[in-house]
A protein has these predicted regions:
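Beta-rich, blade/repeat-based domains predominating
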Residues: 5-25, 30, 48-64, 68-73, ...
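A short loop-to-beta-strand structural motif that recurs across blades of beta-propeller domains
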Residues: 32-35, 74-76, 115-117, 156-158
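Short loop/turn segments that connect beta-strands within beta-propeller blades
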Residues: 36-41, 78-83, 119-124, 161-163
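A short beta-strand motif characteristic of beta-propeller blades
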Residues: 1-4, 41-48, 83-89, 123-129
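Short, structured loop/turn "capping" segments at alpha-beta junctions
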Residues: 29-31, 40-43, 52, 77, ...
């Protein structure tokens, strides 16, 4: 089946919770994150500020929703109620993808600057890779402990082993 999100203009990043709830960013106006239940009911989860061209969406280990903006370097964690719990900051802006690993570390890709920021719990962000052309959405390979990064303009994938 398919689900229409009323008012959406560019659904982009997607995160899915254990119960099957989907959170999808709308990067263009109106800048929103939608919630779509496992039954297919769509509603607006976050609308407007602090979103600034929201893109990547991930679910953390506590079931909270993590969203990154292209328009700034904010890495925002929202409770399922919609409450903004925390804002962290990637090293660079222009962020496209985000993942959260088992230990709570967040990895953020900057499509604008071609870098990967790592944010360990309670620590400042640090760049762990740079010079990645069009570092877009990312995914985590838990078997190999590595990040896979699509390099859109190069029609290639970057693979970043983690320590």
């Amino acid at each position: 089946f398919s689900v229409a999100a009323a008012g959406a203009s560019m659904l982009n990043g997607i995160g899915v919770t254990e119960d099957g709830t989907i959170y999808a960013s709308n990067t263009r106006d109106p800048q929103r994150v939608y919630r779509i239940t496992a039954d297919g009911d769509a509603s607006v989860f976050i609308d407007g500020s602090p979103l600034m061209a929201p893109n990547g969406v991930a679910i953390d280990n506590d079931g909270n929703i993590v969203v990154v903006n292209i328009g700034n370097n904010h890495v925002m964690t929202f409770a399922p109620s919609g409450e903004l719990l925390q804002t962290e900051y990637a090293v660079e802006a222009g962020n496209d993808g985000v993942i959260v690993t088992e230990d709570g570390t967040k990895y953020v890709s900057s499509v604008r600057f071609g870098s990967i920021s790592r944010i360990r719990p309670g620590e400042e962000a640090e760049v762990i890779a740079q010079g990645i052309p069009s570092a877009a959405s990312i995914c985590y390979d838990s078997v190999q402990n590595q990040i896979i990064i699509p390099m859109n303009n190069n029609n290639a994938l970057g693979i970043l082993p983690l320590d």
